[in-house]
Each structure stands twice: as structure tokens, then as C-alpha cells.
Amino acid sequence: LNQTALTRRSPAWGRLAAYLQKRQFWLYRNTDAAYFGEGESFFRDLVEHLRQAETYIFMEYYILAEGTVWDEIFAVLKERAAAGVEIHLIIDDFGTLTRLSDGTLQAIKDAGIEVEIFNPVHRYINRLYFNYRDHRKITVIDGYVAYAGGINIGDEYANRIERFGYWKDSTVRLTGDGAWGFAVQFMQMWKMLGRHFP
């Protein structure tokens, strides 16, 4: 991406591009973005795109909660896994501690989905590392579609149940080359957790 051309269009964009490039982040072109200002529309769009996955799906969430939202997503993931799509899931142990049963976790694994639990909670954990959490909320589909934002997987994020009042949060979908940056982030975390790709 040409930083000079960006600077001509907007000095602020040029400064941001320079900042990112200096820190060795990749900049992408050929990318469209769609904004979702609430959970229900995001989940509808996510399920639609998950159905189209052909090669792989990466999902990384702080909270994955049992409920109707997860049931809809899991039904599609099971179908795609049975069709040969590789599915890798990272969930934060503390975020899902009371929201995901051992039975559901086993069902996910039994469906052929590779799962990694980030920073498992146990009684001997050092207080310093207890707060070391994975708050990412991303999904990557075939390296071409990526979602990132503030919405976890749970019914309250779609306002199907009320836990803390009406839930207002957002997510963006990137379609195109820019989705690859999220795929790289996920793969780096997967490898950091001691896992490998076939």
C-alpha cells in the first residue's frame, strides 16, 4: 500500500499507515468493510458466511456461551466440519467459565472442531497471570472474510436474553485481502498455545 498516496488523501491516514508499517503491521488494499451496530444482524451475517466456508474457519472469542445463538452457529460448524472444512476455535477459560458446560465442550470436539482453551483457570495460578486473558472476538473464513469487534458469542449480545440491559455493541466484517491479517493473528495465537496446523 502506498503511504504517500494515502497521505495525499488524508494526512491522518498517512500517519496511521506510517505508524503501522513502522511496527511491521501489514497494510491491505482490495478490502470491503461492513459495519454491524448490534448483535442480531451480526449473527445473521456470520451464520450466512459460515455456511459458505470451503477450506477453514478460525474463531477466537473471550466468551462462548450456551444458548440459541451458539446452537445456530454450532449447527453450521458441525455441518461444515462434516464436509471437510478445518475448524479451529480458541476460547478464554475465564470468559467461558460459567457459560460453557463440559458436555458442550466435548460435543464441539466430537464434531471434529479443534479447540484450545486460553489460560486455563486453576487454583495454583499466579495472580499476575490470572488477569492474562484473551479478549479477542474474531472469526476468519477461508482467509477472505473476517469479523472483528466487541461482540462475544452469547444470547445477550443478540438481545435474546437480558443480562445487563439492552446490549449495544458492534462488529465489522472485512471481505478481501484485509481478512488475511486476522488469519495471521489467529495462527500466531494457535502456535503460541503449542498447536500446529496440518
For the regions a language model picked out, list residue spans one by one:
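N-terminal localization/anchoring segments of enzymes in phospholipid and broader phosphate metabolism
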Residues: L1-P198
